[in-house]
Amino acid sequence: MTQKRVLIIEDDLDMIGLLKIILKRGGYEPISALGGKEGLRLLQEASVDLILLDLMMDDINGWEVLERIKADPALRMVPVIIVSARHQAEDPGQTETHSDQFEGYVVKPFVVRDLLTQIQEVIP
């Protein structure tokens, strides 16, 4: 069975490392991009089954990255799970505006089981 490839778009190296460990233990193939710009570039080069996307990044915020992904015909069908320190209630306008563009939302710090459950629901 082929492993599902998951792209982590995050600007915190420690969080990238943690997510890679979790994904590997969950049976996924993680690849990572340090920030939104690198994530968008990597998406042009690599095929992925899922994107884990941080919202608060220094170079491009996650909402803009999400908009660019969903505007690209080659990428718009790739599911996205938001992994952010911001609760949805902290950003209701953005969350409501983009609610049809992401498949899950996990708040940091998260319970590993909850993250893996959301991933399994999106890419079984």
Regions found by a protein language model. Give the residues of each.
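Active-site residues of response regulator receiver
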Residues: 54, 84
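Alpha4 helix (beta4-alpha4-beta5 surface) of REC/receiver domains from two-component response regulators
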Residues: 64, 87-106, 113, 117-120
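Helix N-cap/capping motif at the beta->alpha junctions
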Residues: 32-41, 62
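Conserved acidic carboxylate
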Residues: 10
